[in-house]
Each structure stands twice: as C-alpha cells, then as structure tokens.
C-alpha cells in the first residue's frame, strides 16, 4: 500500500467526521455519583481525556485554572463563541460556560478519547454535531437512595435538596436519549460497567476504521456510503 493511499484513507476518515478517538458524554442527576465514577475511570484509563469547560465565573476557593475550569473574561468568551470555538455553551446564573470544540477535535484526531461531564441539554447540542458521540446516563438505584446520598454529602440545606430532587425527576426523563445506562447501586459494579462501555465503543466499526484505516483499505473494507 502506497503512502498516498494510507494518507488518503486517514484523510477520508477525518473528512467523514470519524476520528481515532471517541467522544463520551456522561449525564446524571446531582447525587447519582457521576463525578466519583468519572474520576475513577480516568485514573484507570490514561487514554481518556476529561474536557475542561471555559467559564466566566470567578474561581472558587481551591479551584485552579486549567484543572477545574478555564477561567476567562466575558469578552474573551464572546470572541471564542463568535469564532464557533464552542461545541456547546450556556448561560447559568449570569455566567457563561462553554465546551471547547477545537480542543476536543485535536484530542480525538490524535487518538485520545474525550469525556464530557455534561447535562442533558448540552448532550443534545453535542449529539447534533458529533453523531458518533456516546451518551451514558448514570442512574441512582432509587429516588430514596438519591435523597439519602444528597443528605449524606452534607453540602446542601434541606430546601436545596428538595429542589435537586425535583430537578432529578425531569433530568432522569431524558435517560432514554442515551446509548447506555448505568445504575449506580454499588460503586465497583457501576465502574466495571463504565469500563465495558468504553471497551465496546472502541470496537465499533467506525472507531476501528479510524484507528486502522490502512489495514481496512488494504483489505478492501470502506466506510459505509464512501465513494
């Protein structure tokens, strides 16, 4: 196989929006254990990169720029938005939040998987632009368990917990939009299921083609509808 054919296979893969890396979107109501599971997954799988959002809000105590968020000004955020640099963005309580499209595409093109901790509205925006993005919804084993977890965190007043539980009901209604659902009854089992989802996604035809385009073309295998 010539170098030009190899380059052509890889170029066609990228042109078709199929990257060597995968994009995972993890959605869950507050208290379902999303962040704990995501952090554990990231520590076990060095090939996954966590997307860090841009925000115009001020850093909270202990937060570091580039680790928790990319903290920026309203002017800079609006300029980036005008340049279509964000995959999805929203205004929350007077502050802007956005997910960098440029960074995500760069990571996926070099073969890294990218994970987004995101709400269901953001996931809908992402899915419209990345049809191969994989949605994973984390569910609690019951509403009673969710309430108990929120209380044990000790972070919120009772009225805030009540609001979170009400919000959880509307959020959970969007679980059907995800490709996978993980019920977080026990941490170990839920983490194992997340790892299985990642492994299965990496074996999808489009993922394998993007990672091994040279081999697929040599064997006469092409992307569906490819010319």
Swiss-Prot record:
Keyword Transferase: yes
GO molecular function term, any single one: guanylate kinase activity
InterPro entries membership: GK/Ca_channel_bsu, Guanylate_kin-like_dom, Guanylate_kinase, Guanylate_kinase_CS, P-loop_NTPase
Domain of life: Bacteria
UniProt catalytic activity: GMP + ATP = GDP + ADP
Positions that bind ATP: 28-35
Main subcellular location of this protein, as a coarse class: cytoplasm
EC code(s) of this entry: 2.7.4.8
Span of domain Guanylate kinase-like: 21-199
Protein location: Cytoplasm
This protein's UniProt keywords: ATP-binding, Cytoplasm, Kinase, Nucleotide-binding, Transferase
CDD domains the UniProt entry points to: GMPK
SUPFAM superfamilies documented for this protein: P-loop containing nucleoside triphosphate hydrolases
Record-level GO cellular component terms: cytosol
Family affiliation: Belongs to the guanylate kinase family.
HAMAP family: Guanylate_kinase
Function: Essential for recycling GMP and indirectly, cGMP.
Protein name (Swiss-Prot/TrEMBL): Guanylate kinase
Provenance organism: Burkholderia mallei (strain ATCC 23344)
Gene that encodes the chain: gmk
């Amino acid at each position: 196989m010539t170098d030009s054919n190899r380059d052509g296979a890889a170029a066609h893969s990228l042109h078709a929006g199929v990257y060597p890396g995968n994009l995972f979107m993890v959605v869950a109501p507050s208290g379902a254990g999303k962040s704990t599971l995501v952090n554990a997954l990231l520590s076990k799988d060095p090939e996954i990169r966590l997307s860090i959002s841009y925000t115009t809000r001020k850093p909270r105590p202990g937060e570091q720029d580039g680790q928790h968020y990319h903290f920026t000004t309203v002017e800079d955020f609006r300029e980036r938005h005008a340049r279509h640099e964000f995959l999805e963005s929203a205004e929350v309580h007077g502050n802007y939040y956005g997910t960098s499209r440029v960074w995500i595409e760069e990571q996926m093109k070099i073969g890294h998987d990218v994970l987004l901790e995101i709400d269901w509205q953001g996931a809908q925006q992402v899915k419209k632009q990345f049809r191969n993005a994989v949605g994973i919804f984390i569910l609690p084993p019951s509403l009673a368990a969710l309430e108990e977890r929120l209380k044990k965190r000790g972070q919120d007043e009772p009225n805030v917990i009540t609001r979170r539980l009400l919000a959880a009901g509307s959020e959970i209604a969007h679980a059907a939009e995800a490709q996978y659902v993980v019920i977080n009854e026990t941490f170990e089992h839920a983490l194992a299921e997340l790892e299985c989802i990642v492994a299965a996604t990496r074996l999808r035809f489009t993922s394998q083609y993007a990672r091994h385009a040279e081999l697929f073309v040599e064997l006469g295998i092409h992307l569906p509808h490819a010319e």
